[in-house]
């Protein structure tokens, strides 16, 4: 069974909150991908300048609020399955799903939350 997994850039309203470095541009790739249950899926996020490890990953399903998966680039939120992992620092980051499950059909976002200017 093919699964469609979308990776899209999070809107400016979530990328730029008070005190954030909103001059930092985030680029995700791929913009979309097709994968099957059991596949290893990798989504990358690149910052236009170094953000140390100030990066979070979110999963959003239709008609649902975004769910936090990863914070500080590689720390798994409580209750998130261990098949999700994050890595990277500086400008290049990766979200990996080690074995895609049917419930992982969703849109995935990265968000930078670099320190105050």
UniProtKB/Swiss-Prot annotation:
Region (Complementarity-determining-2) location: 72-78
Region annotation (Complementarity-determining-3) ranges: 111-117
GO biological process terms on file: adaptive immune response; immune response
Localisation per UniProt entry: Secreted; Cell membrane
Region (Framework-1): 23-45
Keywords for the protein's UniProt record, in alphabetical order: Adaptive immunity, Cell membrane, Disulfide bond, Immunity, Immunoglobulin, Immunoglobulin domain, Membrane, Secreted, Signal
Complementarity-determining-1 as annotated region, ranges: 46-56
Signal peptide residues on this chain, from the entry's feature table: 1-22
Cellular component per GO, a single term: extracellular region
Cysteine disulfide partners in this protein: 45-110
Gene3D superfamilies cross-referenced by the UniProt entry: Immunoglobulins
InterPro entries in the record: Ig-like_dom (IPR007110), Ig-like_dom_sf (IPR036179), Ig-like_fold (IPR013783), Ig_sub (IPR003599), Ig_V-set (IPR013106), IgV_Light_Chain (IPR050150)
Origin superkingdom: Eukaryota
Domain Ig-like: start-end pairs: 24-117
Molecular-function GO terms, alphabetical: antigen binding
Region of interest: Framework-3: 79-110
Chain intervals for the UniProt region annotation (Framework-2): 57-71
Effect on the protein upon substituting residue 48 to R: In IMGT allele IGKV1D-16*02
Record note on quaternary structure: Immunoglobulins are composed of two identical heavy chains and two identical light chains; disulfide-linked.
Functional note: V region of the variable domain of immunoglobulin light chains that participates in the antigen recognition. Immunoglobulins, also known as antibodies, are membrane-bound or secreted glycoproteins produced by B lymphocytes. In the recognition phase of humoral immunity, the membrane-bound immunoglobulins serve as receptors which, upon binding of a specific antigen, trigger the clonal expansion and differentiation of B lymphocytes into immunoglobulins-secreting plasma cells.
Protein name: Immunoglobulin kappa variable 1D-16
Organism: Homo sapiens
Gene: IGKV1D-16
